[in-house]
Structure formats: structure tokens, C-alpha cells
């Protein structure tokens, strides 16, 4: 089996996790208590969904996941929520004091105490797998737990499971909306280790998703639940090929191979279509070409950055539902002729497509309409650098005055770590610039390998 372990860290990671597991359960017909009426082969672990769920002897399906937070309130909601019987109590790990929006607390002081317990639980999950394929890590980098403990866990996973791939779903601070003053510090410090310790990181930002909810779903004041349900659709689409037997399957390691041209250039944009409310769905024809065009629209991107300002290096299209390869090929051919979708000149093909015949499910009473077919795109575009330069700029404004730095130093960090992380990000911006530059002939020494 090719199992995947999901790790949800901090408030954002846990709440996105709730939305994801709710959706997975719906898709597989698993009840909130973990039973699966349709599963005839009880105890046989050969079904495709066993990549995400482990099956107990009594026929209960338990998510291969852990939820970690440094303070209990958010995890207590899981412990008392409608899916409380789905998880083993040991999978929900909470501390007593939170990271107070401070990377250093999450990474050094408070996080240190809980990280061994987390790794212990991960080890138990891993021992339960026959062929662990990798980890999905969910966190936000603006707060303290997601950024600090998130980085710490990623670093430790690299040590313990060096060869396994790690996919991050990372919520980045939005340009306008902010939940903490020190977001730029936490993000820069955390990205420093995301660079090293994740193989693919999908960037999400709340503001972009708010806008999609407002515009496409007519929700005037979107809540986190609305946002997370949209995010969970993306994550579900990415993982359908692992959880169902499909037509053209896309494996986690395949993502890496097809999306990451150079190890550091692994920050992805994602988009999903059709995002449409039930009232509108009746009146629109959502054909394969239409939804394919929609995912390339700048307004569909789940992070605030404009793909037209950059060039695509690669993109992965995951279709699900009533889709045949012929339609996909036609739609992709049309996209290639568009001038707005520009590829770097050293990567002319750039499309990886997957199709899964399982139609998209929606949460009953949710905002999204039930549709016949949907597509999710994960793309590697040089415009992602906009996200970093925005955060770097805010970081510089504060760091020039050393504002708030004493809180970090007081928790055992050294000032040098700030400048080290900041330099790493400056180098990353530069990397993106070079990758998107016209022609690769200015790097003469690299062309001689052929």
C-alpha cells in the first residue's frame, strides 16, 4: 500500500483538517463513527482508501492523521465535534499554553516539549503502514504554532524519514488581511525551513479565498468554514488518485517529479473550478474546456498573486468526474495557444494531467453545488515570488527598527537567525527571477552537460 500520513498543526492546520476529513468521509461513505456500511471486505486492507484510513479488526476506519496544537481550545472542538469518534484520542495532541503568535515559542521553548510526543504518534502511524509514501503537512505560517512547531516537525521528519516525500499545504499571510502584527517575522522564519524540508508546498492565502467565496459563491461575509471547505476540495482533488482507483492516476511522488524543476523552486499555486453556488449551477454548462479555462484565470488562484506577471514552469491538472482524455487534450491544446498563459522557454510541454472517474462530492448544506465534473490545478509559476517579496518587504520595515524582536530573543532565538532566514528568502526571490529570465544561455557552464 502507498499510505499517506496527514499532520495538522496549529489552529489553521486543524480547521482545514476538519474540513478535509469531513469531505473524505463523505466521498468514501464512512460514517462519523468510522464505520463504513458499503465496505464488504472488513479487515482487508487492499482498498484504495486504505492509503488514508487504517482499518481496525472491528471494521472501524481511522484516519492516518495527527492533530497538534500548543493550546487545547481548537483541538477540544474536534474532541467534542461530530467526528469525535472518528479519531483515536492519541491522535489529538494538545499542550497547555499556546505559542502566542511567536515563532520562537513554537520552535524552541513550548514546541520542544511536545515534539517528541508528536513524533512518537507519527511513528505509531508509520509502523501501521506497509509502504509509507509520505506526509501531508497542514499549517499556517503567520501564527506561532503553525510556523514554529510546523518547522520543527518538518525538520525532525526529515531526520527520521529522510526519503519520504513531504507535501505542505501552507496558509500564507494575506496582503491586506492580517491576524497578527508579527506575521512577517513568523512567515520568513518558517519559510526558511519549508525551503529545506518540504518537497512541494502549495501556497494558500485567506484573502484570495475570501474573494473567491464572495465573487463566485455570493457569500457576503465568508467564515473560516466557507474557506476551509473550498481548500478541502483542492486537497481532495489532489488526493483522489491515491484514494480511488482512477483512469490516469497521479501519485504524490509524481507531483514532485513533474512540478519541481529545481529543488528550491517548489512553491505552487493552486486553483479549482467550478466554484459555483447551487442556484447558478442549473443554468450553466460546465464543459471540460470551460472549467479548464477557469482554473487558469488569475481570479481563481488561491493565493494573491497574478500568474500573468510570471511564466509557468509546469502545471498539473487533476480532473474528476465525467471527463475523457480526448476532451482534456483538446482543452489543453486550446490553453497552449493562449497568449495569456506563458511558459518558460525551457519547458515547452509543461502539462501533467490526471483523470479520476469519481465525481466531486460536496458537503450537504455547504456552499458548493454538486457538479458532474471538476478540475483542480497545481501550477509552478514564477509569479509566486510576489508572495515572498510582499512578506519580505513587511519584514524589512519592522526589522529595520528591530520592532518586536525582543520577544523572539527572549525565547532563546538569536538575532542572527532573522538575518539568515531573510537572506535565504532574498536568494529565493533571486532564484525565481533567474528561472523566469528569457533564455537559459547566460548560464553557459550548465549547457555543456548534454
Swiss-Prot record:
What GO cellular-component annotations does this UniProt entry give? cytoplasm; microtubule
Key word Kinase present: no
Q: Which SUPFAM superfamilies does the protein's record reference?
A: Tubulin C-terminal domain-like (SSF55307), Tubulin nucleotide-binding domain-like (SSF52490)
Record keywords, A-Z:
Cytoplasm, Cytoskeleton, GTP-binding, Hydrolase, Magnesium, Metal-binding, Microtubule, Nucleotide-binding
Q: Which cofactor does it need?
A: Mg(2+)
Q: List the catalysed reactions.
A: GTP + H2O = GDP + phosphate + H(+)
Q: What are its GO biological-process terms?
A: microtubule cytoskeleton organization; mitotic cell cycle
Q: For this protein, what is the EC number?
A: 3.6.5.-
Q: Which SMART domains match?
A: Tubulin, Tubulin_C
User: Do you know which Pfam families this protein is assigned to?
Assistant: Tubulin, Tubulin_C
Which Gene3D superfamilies does UniProt cross-reference here? Helix hairpin bin, Tubulin/FtsZ, C-terminal domain, Tubulin/FtsZ, GTPase domain
**What is the annotated localization of this protein?**
Cytoplasm, Cytoskeleton
Q: How is it modified after translation?
A: Undergoes a tyrosination/detyrosination cycle, the cyclic removal and re-addition of a C-terminal tyrosine residue by the enzymes tubulin tyrosine carboxypeptidase (TTCP) and tubulin tyrosine ligase (TTL), respectively.
Q: Which terms does the record give in the GO molecular function aspect?
A: GTP binding; hydrolase activity; metal ion binding; structural constituent of cytoskeleton
Q: Where is this site: Involved in polymerization?
A: 450
- Residues binding Mg(2+): 71
Active site location: 254
Q: Which residues bind GTP?
A: 11, 71, 144-145, 179, 206, 228
Q: Which domain of life is it from?
A: Eukaryota
Q: How does it assemble?
A: Dimer of alpha and beta chains. A typical microtubule is a hollow water-filled tube with an outer diameter of 25 nm and an inner diameter of 15 nM. Alpha-beta heterodimers associate head-to-tail to form protofilaments running lengthwise along the microtubule wall with the beta-tubulin subunit facing the microtubule plus end conferring a structural polarity. Microtubules usually have 13 protofilaments but different protofilament numbers can be found in some organisms and specialized cells.
Family stated for the protein in its record: Belongs to the tubulin family.
Q: Report the function annotation for this chain.
A: Tubulin is the major constituent of microtubules, a cylinder consisting of laterally associated linear protofilaments composed of alpha- and beta-tubulin heterodimers. Microtubules grow by the addition of GTP-tubulin dimers to the microtubule end, where a stabilizing cap forms. Below the cap, tubulin dimers are in GDP-bound state, owing to GTPase activity of alpha-tubulin.
Entry protein name = Tubulin alpha-6 chain
* Biological classification of the source: Eukaryota, Viridiplantae, Streptophyta, Embryophyta, Tracheophyta
Gene (name only): TUBA6
